[in-house]
Curated annotation (Swiss-Prot):
It comes from Pseudomonas putida (strain GB-1). One of its GO terms (molecular function) is phospholipid binding. It holds the Pfam family LpxB. Belongs to the LpxB family. NCBIfam families: lpxB. Keywords: Glycosyltransferase, Lipid A biosynthesis, Lipid biosynthesis, Lipid metabolism, Transferase. Its EC number is 2.4.1.182. This is Lipid-A-disaccharide synthase. Pathway: Bacterial outer membrane biogenesis; LPS lipid A biosynthesis. It is an enzyme of class 2 (transferase). InterPro entries: Glyco_trans_19. It catalyses: a lipid X + a UDP-2-N,3-O-bis[(3R)-3-hydroxyacyl]-alpha-D-glucosamine = a lipid A disaccharide + UDP + H(+). GO terms for cellular component: membrane. It comes from the Bacteria. The gene is lpxB.
Amino acid sequence: MAQLCVALVAGEASGDILGSGLMRALKARHPDVRFIGVGGPLMEAEGLQSYFPMERLAVMGLVEVLGRLRELLKRRKLLIQTLIDEKPDVFIGIDAPDFTLNIELKLRQAGIKTVHYVSPSVWAWRQKRVLKIREGCDLMLTLLPFEARFYEEQGVPVRFVGHPLADTIPLEADRSVARAALGLGEGPIVALMPGSRGGEVGRLGALFLDAAEHLCQQVPGVRFVLPCANAARRAQVEHMLEGRQLPLTLLDGQSHQALAACDAVLIASGTATLEALLYKRPMVVAYRLAPLTYWILKRLVKSPYVSLPNLLAQRELVPELLQDQATSQALANTLAPLVRDGSQQTERFDEIHRTLRRDASNQAAEAVLALLKDR
């Protein structure tokens, strides 16, 4: 069996999780494999030779990207040339479409097979990107079923592999075990999840803490947990907590334990909303962007929803309070009844979980190797 060289690029923590799972599954099927590209600590632990820190790609929002555009373009140009020189058997771009789609196009033109893992939101906005995907991508791997249908209609080779989170999160999470592990007792608990990026926490952190203070007046005995993605986010939140008397426990990571332990979640739009759905926890989704970014997106976005639970259901399962709607009082008012009883909201969550539970990393590995079988 000849050595396989696989190039991968992931742009943020969720991509690092997907990439490491795919790498493990590829190694199980083809032990003589070398990994190069850009990834985080999980991918590096699986053997990735990372050319530069993944964090340099983790930028959110149109306005925020402009501040780093020169660096991003310079890194991308250098990376394309490095990969053309290395001639990997396949390039796999994991999410980060504004960075990776251009790489895929250039590498495919150079005769390298290309895969994109995690569909960009082309069905929601900037739909013309599908033309670039069709030209630059030998195979699209989607995590969600409605995405695969979209690509089939557009003539792009596609495979729905399911979502790795649906594989790893149990169909029924034990709330009491999670509470014991976190040292939490009985009584109502709300998880506050304002995001993992500095910009997100900057825009949503204090808002969520204000909402928590309002909620204390509406739900007697309520307590809060807030998982921090890293030490920098923890320091950011600790600064916001100064002068407040909230019954709140900060956690280092442990977002899954927080979701398992809680009764309801106040959460930023993003992958974490899918995690909350998979844990069958009722949620209120909130998001704020830089005003100019929001103004532009509002005019571009075709989808009526932003959160994954609503996109998967194709209807409003969970409330979304965005931009000016996301006031602390409105968040508390919407969340309070869900803390008391959110069962009506979560009725469809189990069905969605089972649809997404397909052994994603192995499905993705098989699809990649099938693409390479004639190399």
